[in-house]
Amino acid sequence: LSSPSLTDCESPARAPGFRLSGSPKAEEVIMPSIIETTVYAFDELSDSAKEKALDWYREAGLDHDWFEFVFEDFERVCDLLGTEIRTVPVRLHGGGTRRKSCIWFSGFWSQGDGACFEGDYSYKSGASAAVRSYAPQDGELHRIADALAAIQRRNFYRLRARLTHRGRYHHEYSMAIAVERRGPCRQDMTGDAEEAVSEALRDLARWLYGQLEREHDHLMSDETVADAIRANDYRFTEDGAHVG
């Protein structure tokens, strides 16, 4: 006897696991796995693991605005010396604007690193005494204040200067400094006035860079970084890799 043939309307019975060619595969269900590991506090690590933990924090843990305190101090010094830092409006993420001081720096590894700023300088009575009162131990600031006072005295306290940033680098020589003598008689300033004022203001930018570099070195020191790690209770693997 011949086997019965299938008609167009009939389908063969499918055995378990049978799949027609072209039909989608069932998605595999991947179950999550749990991995247990031992974590350590900073002081429980070996010396080599501590070095790795310190390096991690130096790269990831430093606040992006760590220099704001130095900028605020610098603006205070500028005010005492008679220099008004220029500000520009910047938009806030939540709406509105705030004023941002025109102070810049780059550092601290390349030969061209430094700091610069924009603003207007003019004579301010009692600047030398005010600077000494504010920073009694800072001989460099005293020297800058005295240099500005001396050149102002020779020009009857009528010198003014405008400082603007130029180029894409940030150091004392990326500032254009225009010095002039103002007054009703339109007298010429002394021959050394422009150089003396410019050099004193560039020294002020150098002083700012030194303050930034010292603050950065302090924040990156082993002791300060270790204290920050302890305060935040960060945890690490045995070889010093951060966990979390």
Positions of predicted regions on the chain:
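Short, Lys/Arg-enriched N-terminal segments with co-localized hydrophobic residues
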Residues: 1, 9-30
